[in-house]
């Protein structure tokens, strides 16, 4: 597969390049960055020293590639496509939020393989899910299939600083972020609609009607670089053994999403494309914990997973990664 990358200078693009350089079926044809054209990739992504001598380019030779990854900031992908024509035979995987929500004229398939694998396999265009959205909905989807989410869901999730992107800002500065934490966008985070969209899809397919509960989501900024750890609380009288069995069955064929019987932590998933999930019951309250690496399963790892599915190769190819901590 010949690959083009647009918006090649950010954190997500750097991770994408790292994954693709080690992917046995991938060949990077071009990495576009207007601001870095002519510079070596390693001038920006210094962790790739010794792995590539590619340079950034201002060119976009779409006729020479099979698939293009959009690593733009949110809102820029749709604007780009209005000004540039990409050949119909070239597949697109967009990592921004522009096409995640279904609407008239949007042919992008929502790129969560755990529920949309068959559609992704036939898709020409895929909208890669958001990082918080991935972690939270993977924690809740089996509960939606069970039909037990009939009350508001309390969600808390903390993310690493790379989730804010490469551009420096007041809340990403080391002196502020280190030994600190804070909330942002409480009850109004942009990922909530896509979470509800997927929960509605699964709940309807299971014959449990429309999803109408509120996702009361409080996002937190953490003082670490990578990872998302989320808790989701659902009220239900269903016994824990039945819930665990349903979770294991839901993800039985998912190569990266796993229900585990012990409590989970971030170090088990950082630098991998995995999502780990654990459930506990306290009275009528079901506590679900889920965690991912925000740059991998929450971004480019899932994007490459989608690419693999789109081209009919092994879903985990190039993504058999070891956690960085142990």
Each PLM stretch: what is its role?
Residues 183-187, 220-222, 265-269:
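Short Gly/Pro-enriched turn/cap motifs at secondary-structure boundaries
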Residues 230-326:
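C-terminal active-site/capping subdomain that shapes the small-molecule cofactor and substrate pocket
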Residues 17, 137-144, 192-196, 244, ...:
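Predominant activation on well-ordered alpha-helical scaffold segments within soluble catalytic domains
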């Amino acid at each position: 597969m010949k690959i083009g990358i647009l918006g090649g200078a950010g954190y997500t693009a750097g991770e994408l390049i790292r994954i693709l350089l080690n992917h046995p079926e991938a060949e990077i044809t071009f990495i576009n960055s207007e601001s870095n054209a002519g510079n070596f990739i390693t001038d920006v992504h210094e962790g790739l020293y010794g792995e590539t001598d590619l340079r950034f380019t201002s060119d976009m030779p779409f006729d020479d590639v099979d698939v293009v990854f959009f690593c733009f900031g949110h809102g820029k992908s749709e604007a780009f496509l209005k000004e540039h024509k990409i050949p119909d035979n070239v597949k697109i995987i967009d990592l921004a939020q522009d096409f995640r929500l279904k609407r008239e004229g949007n042919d992008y398939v929502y790129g969560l393989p755990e529920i949309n694998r068959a559609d992704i396999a036939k898709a020409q265009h895929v909208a890669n899910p958001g990082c918080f959205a991935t972690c939270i909905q993977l924690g809740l989807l089996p509960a939606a299939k069970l039909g037990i989410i009939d009350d508001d869901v309390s969600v808390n999730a903390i993310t690493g600083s790379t989730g804010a992107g490469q551009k420096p800002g007041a809340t990403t500065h080391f002196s502020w972020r280190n030994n600190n934490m804070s909330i942002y966008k409480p009850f109004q985070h942009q990922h909530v609609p896509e979470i509800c969209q997927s929960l509605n899809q699964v709940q309807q397919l299971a014959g449990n009607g429309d999803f109408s509960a509120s996702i009361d989501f409080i996002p937190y900024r953490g003082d670490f670089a990578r990872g998302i750890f989320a808790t989701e609380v659902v009220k239900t009288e269903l016994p824990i053994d039945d819930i665990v069995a349903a979770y294991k069955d839901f993800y039985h064929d998912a190569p990266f999403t796993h229900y585990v019987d012990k409590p989970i932590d971030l170090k088990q998933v950082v630098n991998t494309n995995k999502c780990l999930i654990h459930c506990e019951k306290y009275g009528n309250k079901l506590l679900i914990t889920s965690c991912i690496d925000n740059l991998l399963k929450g971004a480019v790892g899932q994007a490459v997973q989608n690419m693999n599915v789109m081209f009919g190769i092994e879903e985990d190819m190039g993504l058999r990664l070891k956690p960085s901590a142990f």
